[in-house]
């Protein structure tokens, strides 16, 4: 019975057959079957890392590099990287090989790595990042979208900023991240832009907000669309216009947010007598 239990624990991650072993990198490291090092290729997203693994055994090994592994910069000034695509690496006895790895920065406040920066790799990320990595392992989006999704969890950035030009493509990922974070699916889309300075620091700037604002208007009114901060202070008047009487209508929004600071706001449709609609959003 004891032997059966031990064998069951190893199924799926480790097996031996005709002196060929397939084993997860984590188990191979724990059992000292391999030694491994990770290095940056000089970027913080996409195929930006390389892992070098040496087989220390007399058998051939097939190493599974798991999605969800967190590569930790040995210099705390630089970003950690989350692996989002699993890879298999075959090694003959005593052989050493390198393999490129797809991953994303999961520490937005730190600097982007330079080429050759060494990373530690004997650690899986937290549960939420592992869930996201496993999702990205089998679902593909553009690099900016995937990077934004990682930051939405690792750095608690706004889930609404997970977008693509064809937003129907990004919607499932936005829904997935909202589920992981246990928050409502955002009613709006926040378009942003990243800028990396020569120091390696990365800043993120808001571009615009898109969505639909539901309202009801009992009679013809002159209405104004405004943005209010979390202290109730007007921070932007978008436009004023005549609004026909209508019930349960929708106003299409495409609002510039250039120059707005990060924080919580509401977008409101008002007349000189009352508020017709209000929606909260965050940058």
What are these regions (language model features)?
Residues 72-120, 233-252:
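Intrinsically disordered, low-complexity Pro/Gly/Ser/Thr-rich segments with frequent PxxP/GP/PP motifs
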